[in-house]
């Protein structure tokens, strides 16, 4: 029995009913990776020996009817900027090549406690800076729907592995769209939770006021199951929130009659491709047929999202990445003959082009002569963007729109044009700036490449997002398409 495209929910039932052993599931996953990943290139490191050992231990517990854990026996792939004790965590950078952590991230502790099985680490844009997974030092992941196309980024490996049926779920991180955009490009479900919903302890920091870990899956309910497992306050992360409600599944099947949905006119404006507009408009009609009330609204400061995001994120990155200096860990230049040379050469040689670009931008924005003109002004714009959402949410339950302005572009098409690449974040960065939850679900295809629909919710109201996304998924999904890839 092949379980390659089985859902998390179905796998849990099969294991609970003893129709399949965790070790059989893990074997099937590694067989699929061996067959498919030389083409997709989603994994950077595999943890096969430990995974098989863990699965065999779970077999014994299964035989004793001791199947504790929300994700008992479920295989998982983890983005390579999330710390995994004893397994390489490189952030897809030469700077951290062969770096093996000696502690565990909070999300990994939670997943291990729920008896999920770590399969390996997934490719990404270097230090999560990029929108195509092409800035990875190690390899370029391809889109399972079209091998000429990018999978999106920065969590491109996480999205591609799920779409290709290599793992039933993965974790990514989202700073300005890095879960939702690759989810849209690869036709899977990706959730960026509310800022503070999931602990960031053990996530290698890019922009600390924006970063958030979230799940990628092939359906909405699976996504909700995984988020339940990783949510919660953490003493090791002072920005994590104490929120009691982490039940995202019990009401997921509830209808959406009367739900008030806002469609911002800016989300279907300039820069959004016609095929994407058409798919989203069709999705809106579907929501109406399900009983939702959809009305046009305005989020007037949307256009300032990209410039303010790139100033703030780059400024925080220039500070966070200052720790990589060639001294304590990471790449150490062998050609340096003084301390100053060691700093300069280790960072110049260890970081890639895009990472250095953002460090330069952030350092400039924080410099004394430009701080007020760039960083301070961007923070003021951030407040305006948040206020726009607050005003809309006084009268509406959910905001809907495209996840990305286009479908996936071709490999090599935009990598040398950073401004065009940054423009792809038009519809995702405002959600991070406002600290809100956002989920991307498939809503169509154009020339064989998936289109993503984004739902944005009130702070800590992931439950409503899952409900509306689940109901929409009953009318449109790609479940029958994955196996044909």
UniProtKB/Swiss-Prot annotation:
Organism: Staphylococcus aureus (strain bovine RF122 / ET3-1)
Span of the signal peptide: none
Cellular component GO terms, alphabetical: glutamyl-tRNA(Gln) amidotransferase complex
Reaction catalyzed: L-glutamyl-tRNA(Gln) + L-glutamine + ATP + H2O = L-glutaminyl-tRNA(Gln) + L-glutamate + ADP + phosphate + H(+)
Protein's name in the database: Glutamyl-tRNA(Gln) amidotransferase subunit A
EC number of the protein: 6.3.5.7
Keywords from the UniProt entry: ATP-binding, Ligase, Nucleotide-binding, Protein biosynthesis
InterPro entries on file: Amidase (IPR000120), Amidase_CS (IPR020556), Amidase_dom (IPR023631), AS_sf (IPR036928), GatA (IPR004412)
Stated family: Belongs to the amidase family. GatA subfamily.
Top-level taxon: Bacteria
GO biological process: translation
Residues forming the catalytic site: 79, 154, 178
Keyword Plastid: no
Assembly and binders: Heterotrimer of A, B and C subunits.
Gene that this polypeptide is encoded by: gatA
Function statement: Allows the formation of correctly charged Gln-tRNA(Gln) through the transamidation of misacylated Glu-tRNA(Gln) in organisms which lack glutaminyl-tRNA synthetase. The reaction takes place in the presence of glutamine and ATP through an activated gamma-phospho-Glu-tRNA(Gln).
UniProt keyword annotation of ATP-binding present: yes
One Pfam assignment: Amidase
HAMAP family, per the entry: GatA
Sample GO molecular function, one term: glutaminyl-tRNA synthase (glutamine-hydrolyzing) activity
């Amino acid at each position: 029995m092949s379980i390659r495209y089985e859902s998390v929910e179905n796998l849990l039932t099969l294991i609970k009913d003893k129709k399949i052993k965790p070790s059989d599931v893990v074997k099937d996953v590694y067989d699929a990776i061996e067959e498919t990943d030389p083409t997709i290139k989603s994994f950077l490191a595999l943890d096969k020996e430990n995974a098989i050992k863990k699965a065999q231990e779970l077999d014994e517990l299964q035989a004793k009817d001791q199947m504790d854990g929300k994700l008992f026996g479920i295989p998982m792939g983890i983005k390579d900027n999330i710390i995994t004790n004893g397994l390489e965590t490189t952030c897809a950078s030469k700077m951290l090549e062969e770096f093996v952590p000696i502690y565990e991230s909070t999300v990994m502790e939670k997943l291990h406690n729920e008896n999920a099985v770590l399969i390996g680490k997934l490719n990404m844009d270097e230090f999560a800076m990029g929108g195509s997974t092409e800035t990875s030092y190690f390899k370029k992941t391809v889109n399972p729907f079209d091998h000429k196309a990018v999978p999106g980024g920065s969590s491109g490996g996480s999205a591609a592995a799920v779409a290709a049926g290599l793992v039933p779920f993965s974790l990514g991180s989202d700073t300005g769209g890095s879960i939702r955009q690759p989810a849209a490009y690869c036709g899977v479900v990706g959730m960026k939770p509310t800022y503070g919903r999931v602990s960031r302890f053990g996530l290698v920091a890019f922009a600390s006021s924006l970063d958030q870990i979230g799940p990628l899956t092939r359906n909405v309910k699976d996504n909700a199951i995984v988020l339940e497992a990783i949510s919660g306050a953490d003493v090791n992360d002072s920005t994590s929130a104490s929120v009691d409600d982490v039940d995202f599944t019990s009401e997921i099947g509830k209808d959406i009659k009367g739900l008030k949905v806002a469609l911002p006119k800016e989300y279907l404006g300039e820069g959004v491709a016609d095929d994407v507009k058409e798919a989203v408009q069709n999705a809106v009609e579907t929501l109406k047929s399900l009983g939702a009330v959809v009305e046009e609204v305005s989020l007037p400061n949307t256009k300032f999202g990209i410039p303010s995001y790139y100033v703030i994120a780059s400024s925080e990155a220039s500070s966070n990445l200052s720790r990589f200096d060639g001294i304590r860990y990471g790449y150490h230049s062998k050609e340096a003959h003084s301390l100053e040379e060691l700093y300069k050469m280790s960072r110049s040689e260890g970081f890639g082009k895009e990472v250095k670009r953002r460090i330069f931008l952030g350092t400039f924005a924080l410099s004394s002569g430009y701080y007020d003109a760039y960083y301070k002004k961007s923070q003021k714009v951030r407040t305006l963007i948040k206020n726009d959402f607050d005003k809309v949410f006084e009268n509406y339950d959910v905001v809907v729109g495209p996840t990305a302005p286009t479908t996936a572009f071709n490999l090599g098409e935009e990598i040398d044009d950073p401004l065009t690449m940054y423009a792809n974040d038009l519809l995702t960065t405002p959600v991070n700036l406002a600290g809100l939850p956002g989920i991307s679900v498939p809503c169509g295809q154009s020339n064989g490449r998936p289109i993503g629909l984004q739902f944005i919710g009130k702070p800590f109201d992931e439950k409503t997002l899952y409900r509306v996304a689940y109901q929409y998924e009953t009318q449109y999904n790609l479940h029958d398409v994955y196996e044909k890839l």
